[in-house]
């Protein structure tokens, strides 16, 4: 896919993710992070949370999926990314990732996306994180 075609086809993309037990335990295994905020319900409650807080970097995994699988080209790679965590994410949350092109550099074929992560709720979706990802085109 040519760069301009990718830009045209990926102006705004939404992808829904689920923080399932498989996602949670899979991340725990690969990160080897057993901090009690993420693993101990009583500890999390003692710190003011209603339950264990999911690993924030699970959202980075969702960004990886967005770039590698949700964009309409496989000829892309992440160059930089950042996420600011605003609210906790919990087990079994449904997360809506909204990505919009923020800037495009035609000369070096780079696209910068603005990212917003929402916890899907019955009444109103809640912004849980935001950030950016810069992608480059593989030649």
Give residue ranges: language-model regions.
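Hot-dog-fold acyl-thioester-processing enzymes
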Residues: 1-76
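Short, intrinsically disordered/low-complexity patches at protein termini
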Residues: 37-38, 49, 62, 77-78, ...
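Sparse recognition of residues in long alpha-helices and their boundaries
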Residues: 43, 79, 108-109
